[in-house]
Amino acid sequence: MYKNRIREIRTEKGMTLEYLSRISQVSIGYLCHLERGTRRNPSMKIMEKISECLDKSVSEIFFNK
């Protein structure tokens, strides 16, 4: 599930949640929900923003491919 991938990649890159929020322009609250799995089905725009900031493809993060 992508919740673990977001946190895993973010921490591997030494990014805080606050930093990822700032560079992706996705709120900390929203990112927290994604990482915890309490928010599902993010929009393609959100997935693209997060993926770009983590330097991964959307499919690598959200579809585990």
Sequence positions of predicted segments:
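A short, Lys/Arg-rich alpha-helix, primarily the initiator
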Residues: M1-E12
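Residues within the helices of the helix-turn-helix
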Residues: R7, E18, E48
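The alpha-helix within a helix-turn-helix
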Residues: R10, S21, S51
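Residue-level detection of the helix-turn-helix DNA-binding "recognition helix"
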Residues: T11, Q25, R36-T38
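Short alpha-helical DNA-recognition segment
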Residues: M15-H33
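DNA major-groove recognition helix of helix-turn-helix
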Residues: E35, P42, I46
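DNA major-groove recognition helix of helix-turn-helix/homeodomain DNA-binding modules
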Residues: K45-E60
